[in-house]
Amino acid sequence: MMNRVILVGRLTKDPDLRYTPNGVAVATFTLAVNRAFANQQGEREADFINCVIWRKQAENVANYLKKGSLAGVDGRLQTRNYEGQDGKRVYVTEVLAESVQFLEPRNGGGEQRGSFNQQPSGAGFGNQGSNPFGQSSNSGNQGNSGFTKNDDPFSNVGQPIDISDDDLPF
């Protein structure tokens, strides 16, 4: 038999990190996963999947993911039950995550709190100051660099980006 779940989605809120009485870390979070098809109004609906992860990975999830972070979860489906406060049996189905992949840079979601892959400023470009294209700031577009002002993909930096609400899963 096979019980395997692979999900990619965005966290609906910050992960909840707790510790068992024995000191084992456990984090819970909910992942919003877009469905592959649109409804009759042309909108893509999302499923909200509860996930649980244990030990060091739970601490990493709590430290490095936050609401809106894009994550990949690999795990298995589990159902557990307990007796609620009203005496009735409560059943919970959730994904027991074996691994969680962080699928975007730390600063990609807005707030910057560091990154696993963060490189020193100017890495890969030598000591060129703030101009990553290797030209001095006052040299203009000399020679045959092949890079004109109209080709600059970052020329609109600082201006709002036009993103439809339909493109956001939350």
Swiss-Prot record:
SUPFAM superfamilies in the cross-refs: Nucleic acid-binding proteins (SSF50249)
Coiled-coil features, chain-numbered ranges: none
GO cellular component, as recorded: nucleoid
Keyword DNA repair: yes
MF term (GO), any: single-stranded DNA binding
InterPro entries: NA-bd_OB-fold, Primosome_PriB/ssb, ssDNA-bd
Pfam family, one: SSB
Transmembrane parts of this sequence: none
Sequence motif Important for interaction with partner proteins, residues: 165-170
Regions of compositional bias (Low complexity) in chain numbering: 128-146
Limits of the SSB domain: 2-104
Example of a GO biological process term: DNA repair
Alphabetical UniProt keywords: DNA damage, DNA recombination, DNA repair, DNA replication, DNA-binding
Region (Disordered): 104-170
Subunit structure, interactors included: Homotetramer.
Biological role: Plays an important role in DNA replication, recombination and repair. Binds to ssDNA and to an array of partner proteins to recruit them to their sites of action during DNA metabolism.
Full protein name: Single-stranded DNA-binding protein
Natural source organism: Bacillus cereus (strain ATCC 14579 / DSM 31 / CCUG 7414 / JCM 2152 / NBRC 15305 / NCIMB 9373 / NCTC 2599 / NRRL B-3711)
This protein's encoding gene: ssb
